[in-house]
């Protein structure tokens, strides 16, 4: 709008009544008829010089007074009802809708004086009620904000509100911020009587009124100025008073805040006032008004900050009460444009460091749509102050508010606001922006003039055309956080119901719980405005941008449901004359997002914990009703359940997996009918909830289950103890490449003892240490093998006396059986005791305690090991080892071993037993088994590598040794010696006495061993002469009768026994020298004649029995049919069996008792050297053979049969 100029100049105020204000008020009231739209239709409606509403022409004070007088004189021309309406409007400070063109009828001239007089009386009454001491407070007798300050503080000048450029040039701040009130002109005298001017003065006064109403005063407000506020009935917009001490949030969206009893002053920020609340802090605000509802009868203005959709054509920021006169009930246009209905005013929050840029205002101006008579004027974009009040016309008081005055108020005030910061905000925000009206006159020349943006211009209202389907969203921006307030409902835009804000989900929340778990939002308290509009009531305490409920929160977000802004027609408070008092007990401020998340976080556990309490209560109450006499009530049970859940929560600190697992365990045990003890303890309080949730599953279990567990545990321990006490009869197991393999034990297997470290074996060859035989064991010949005390077994050995000279040259220990017979046997009374074992023990097992160990000699002579050397096997590092005899009585093969033994490959285990079975019985005496004992730690490690290599592959190693075969056998721990190697005799694995710590039924076991089986070959060197084992007491071998089997055949194969007194044909008899016994030559296979090339007696190729034919010609049965040959491995070799034939010495002796007695005398005579000539021929040959020298060379074993003439061995029987 254009303005002729600003009248500036200081003036002093009357302490009782400000003449300046009084004059202005009268001029403005009387000049109401000169407003566009309020002027009468008749040509003589107004007198005096015609002055446009938007004219900037300066009118002298006197001329204004004359205009007021002429106006009063011509008041008769105005209808009395209109003048009364103007008086009421002037007294109450109400403001009509912007652009409301009232077609007033002609009023008679004689009525104007009466109207002017009534206006003066009303103003005097209002101003007289206020006293000088209530400059900054409300008068109890006057309406809120309808106060006219009667005196001005001393020393305070009155200045006019300057335009922005004048303010910048002059360095003056806003009148509302520098504690100076606007005045009409510098030319005005201090005192001015209340006179009326009919013609030009009202226009000038109205323009001054407009500038003065566009300004505001800060919180201290020293000067008295005129506010547009409401009357005692709440519908007047003219008020003179002090600014409020507390700025309310509703001042941002429109000054519709009813005063609170706590308020100390009135200002335009309150409901009904024409000025918007000014915050001198750091905030800049706009607002997003929604579409207003239709105009109600008597109320041309819509709700706060919303365009009137029907009839109302301006964006109103202050709700107006319906006029008290019917003259104001004028119709307006039927529909408002879509631009007005969907106009949006953006709310922005700023800081005190900067101001809104000027281009924002220009953009808002560009968006504003030109309006016709019923619309906003084109270019209507006045920068709002910090509180961004809306443009609201003064109705019948003025045609429009000056835009320049608005900018003048906005610019300097922003500078003052930046200087003060948040200090004034804490004192109480002061409203400083007043509502501005729009000029509805036909002269719109001010529209062509571009508006000059103020330095601190705030966002301005604009009309924005919203496409279909797009919602108007209200939001609050505070730094990086954007808080959604809601969307304006379009369904209610054109109806009679007030618009609503629909709740929108805030997507900026860190974690948004589900709708069922989201806390319910509480509605903000509503304050009813004078025109029926509802505004949000913020918290009484102001705040900055981050403080909810302060000035930075124009529309606190509705949290649940849609919040209606107001309905003027349906609200009964609209008809009340007094202002509405806001409720003092406002809701607490809503926390920020972080605080809200902390409040919503415990709600996540409410469902789980509530379910636990209910389930626990149901279980306890159900179990309690099962008792015959329940003693607890349901409330007590509920308390117990709640206590258990609280203790469980305290233990786990959350509804995690541990919480749920413990809850299920408690619920299961309390529900179990067998666990009555636990339930009674919980109900009677013997077990507190604290102890209950900390009990283990074993403690929660019923007693019956606990006893069963104890019994099972004791049973398992007993089984383990029994297994440890019983003899080691269980099958042993070993680890193979296929896993753990169980090895069944043989019933005739004897477990032996062995020293784990492999000590040296001590032996004594002295004959003094040998015990003397005490009894004869001939009757037990069926149960033993080669017993020296048995006469039957003794007949096999040649007499040492007879062969004394021969044994002197040769080794007497070549034959293991001959050495065994040459020694005195162990006492036989121990034998029956070993067979009287318990049935559980194998009958052929002789425990170590039952064996008779020879008494240790007083001076034991240690013997060197039979062999020491190095083994180099399978690309494994060589290791040093020594041999320790395990089985066998001959050390010839052991001593013949080379110093370095190298590997020759691997063979399966069954091949070893085949090789052992194929050995000739004559050479079986040299078979022995030794243990390889490494020397040091490194040698032990390499030996274990070789053992693991063979054991994992279930193979036996084969060594390359001359004159003998050497097989390496891995023997796992706790495994006895193979049964096929035990008949060889020897010390065995047992070398030390049984430990006293062990029970008699248990035997000492051994670790993993590496054994070597030595098998003889042809051309074995004779090293037995130096054997240290000569004269050693051998181990007696006994067999069970169940295992040993005898086969007796008929007498068809018995040899031809010569008649008594005649020698046997072919020298078939041999006489024993030492014992005087005679046995057939071909009977004993183990009897060894003296070495020689010739035979004692000529023997036919085929030895025929009389009348019986020849021996079986089958070569395959030659060995098995030999009278004293060792049985095959499948029958007797592996088990030590001996098959007795029909030519057994025992049978032969029984048949020839008579011949033996006769020949005994003859043999005695032959032994005498004097009777050598009388010796028969066979005996002479025997003597010559004994006297013949032995040729050099290795001795040949002739145990398999007689030799032929050439000295070659002749096996018998021979095939014809």
From Swiss-Prot:
Extent of Basic residues compositional bias: 204-213
Acidic residues: bias regions: 581-592
Chain intervals for the UniProt region annotation (Disordered) = 1-74, 166-216, 236-325, 348-462, 511-601, 823-850, 1046-1140, 1176-1216
Q: Which Gene3D superfamilies match?
A: Transcription elongation factor S-II, central domain (1.10.472.30)
What does the record note on quaternary structure?
Answer: Interacts with DNMT3A, DNMT3C and DNMT3L. Interacts with C19orf84. Interacts with SPIN1; promoting recruitment to transposons marked with histone H3 trimethylated at both 'Lys-4' and 'Lys-9' (H3K4me3K9me3).
Associated disease: Spermatogenic failure. A male infertility disorder caused by spermatogenesis defects that result in non-obstructive azoospermia. The disease is caused by variants affecting the gene represented in this entry.
Compositionally biased, Low complexity: which spans? 36-50, 314-325
Compartment(s) of residence = Nucleus; Chromosome
User: Known SMART domains for this protein?
Assistant: TFS2M
Q: TFIIS central domain: which residues? A: 608-728
Q: Where is the composition biased (Gly residues)?
A: 266-278
Tell me the InterPro entries matching this sequence: SPOC_C, TFIIS_cen_dom, TFIIS_cen_dom_sf
Record key words, sorted = Chromosome, Differentiation, Nucleus, RNA-mediated gene silencing, Spermatogenesis
Q: Please give one Gene Ontology molecular function term for this protein.
A: protein-macromolecule adaptor activity
- Tell me, what is an example of a GO biological process annotation in this record? DNA-templated transcription
Q: Where is the signal peptide?
A: none
Q: What is this protein called?
A: SPOC domain-containing protein 1
Known Pfam families for this protein? SPOC (PF07744), TFIIS_M (PF07500)
